[in-house]
């Protein structure tokens, strides 16, 4: 079962958008300048982005915008990406690197369309195509093969599926005993109340929404007595105070 987190919002020209939105307005011409796209803090609304916890990063559960070209995304610096602050934590936001990253994510949590919403839609890849006019994207029919589209084409079935990776270590010193926390790493998610903030570990009172993969117990988080969880600080790929409005969606 995939662990999911709903946090962060996407805005176009200062208006919040709901994934998956149309980047090119109906009245735009194909080569109009792209709109301004921003990733901002969570709004605690259904418009916040849903992410899948997989391979020590977050990958959007669906493309967040469609009818956008690879050239648009380059101009917006959304291919290789940049650092962005979401709810006080800094991440690197970028496009999927290559087909291997996509296939490894599917292998880790399953190919279920209810998780990834990959049927009938494609996601751009950074992976070079070997053709200056065309770029690669995932294929909505054959998962193990990339498809190729024109660099400047805006197509409804092709979109931007962002990836979030931790850019700066969480400031554990700011955490306070008694706080409700949500932290994740590899394929696992821990939801709980902070009991101890040690030198190397966090000890949390487990709450609903916690799901620890057996493969992650030796590296990220392990169950303890009295329904507690010990989290290895060095393996945390993201951590948030629940007061920020972040929702876990197991």
What is the meaning of each model-derived region?
Residues 51, 180-182, 203:
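Residue-level detector of beta-strand face positions
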Residues 191-217:
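Basic/aromatic-rich interaction segments and small domains that mediate binding to polyanionic partners
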Residues 64-72, 188-190, 209-214:
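Short, surface-exposed beta-strand/loop "edge" segments at domain boundaries and coil↔beta transitions
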Residues 1-14, 19, 64-66, 84-191, ...:
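C-terminal, surface-exposed recognition/capping segments
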Residues 55-91:
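Extracellular-facing segments of soluble proteins and assemblies that are Gly/Ser/Thr-biased and enriched
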Residues 54-56, 185-187, 207-210:
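Glycine-centered tight beta-turn/hairpin loop motif at sheet-sheet or coil-to-beta transitions
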Residues 210-250:
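Intrinsically disordered, low-complexity, charged/polar segments
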Residues 1-60, 163:
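GGW-centered surface loops in extracellular recognition modules
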